[in-house]
Regions:
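Short, conserved beta-strand element in jelly-roll/cupin
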Residues: 21-34, 98-111
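Cys/His-clustered metal-coordination modules, chiefly Zn-binding fingers
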Residues: 157-159
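A short hydrophobic beta-strand segment most commonly corresponding to one strand
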Residues: 2-5, 55-73, 124, 133-155
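Short, surface-exposed beta-edge/turn micro-motifs
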Residues: 22-25, 56-57, 99-102, 119-120, ...
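Short acidic-glycine-tyrosine-enriched beta hairpin
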Residues: 32-50, 111-129
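Residue "hotspots" at secondary-structure boundaries inside conserved domains
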Residues: 9, 17, 26, 34, ...
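A short glycine-rich, His/Asp/Glu-containing loop-to-beta-strand
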Residues: 1-22, 62-101, 143-145
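Intrinsically disordered, low-complexity linker/propeptide segments enriched in Ser/Thr/Gly/Pro
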Residues: 27, 39-40, 91, 135-138
Length: 159
């Protein structure tokens, strides 16, 4: 069973967070990391250390695992074809989701499948979105379906 999980990491100035190997995308919602500024994202699959800048950082982190997690902001079981190649893709304020994933409202409010979601509230994709809000999401797409559309970050994953 594959799970996609979203975490919200609130890092104090200079604080570090060690991450185990595994497919992930990190998005800096505010502040900065040593190598990434607010509004930017990065894909990674190796061990990593996130280090907050002088003002700290709020980091949204999506991780793909083969198990369930209890400590995530939101976790969703994702059915994937074990024989297909996939990629994790991070996008902001895009149209319909190209695959299953998890989104997070950054500013404003969105109505997601009839439910009001406020800033830093999370939702499972695909979903029907309406309202005046800004969001970021990570979706899983088949590698052959990656198009030229702009992504904040993306990378191949191996199941």
């Amino acid at each position: 069973m594959t799970s996609l999980s979203l975490y919200e990491d609130l890092l104090a100035p200079g604080e570090t967070l060690e991450l185990a190997p595994g497919g992930r995308i990190v998005y800096v919602a505010s502040g900065e990391l040593a190598t990434l500024h607010a509004g930017h994202a990065a894909f990674g699959a190796d061990e990593a250390v996130l280090e907050a800048g002088a003002d700290g950082a709020t980091v949204l982190r999506w991780e793909l695992t083969e198990w369930s997690v209890d400590d995530a902001k939101l976790s969703a079981h994702i059915d994937l074809d074990p024989w297909a190649d996939y990629a994790m893709r991070c996008e902001r304020d895009a149209g319909a989701a190209a695959g299953p994933g998890i989104g997070c409202v950054l500013r404003g409010e969105l109505v997601v499948d009839g439910e009001l979601v406020q800033p830093f509230g999370a939702f499972v994709e695909p979903a029907e979105l309406a309202g005046r809000g800004s969001f970021v999401r990570v979706v899983l797409v088949r590698a052959e379906e990656l198009n030229g559309a702009e992504a904040l970050a993306q990378g191949a994953i191996h199941l």
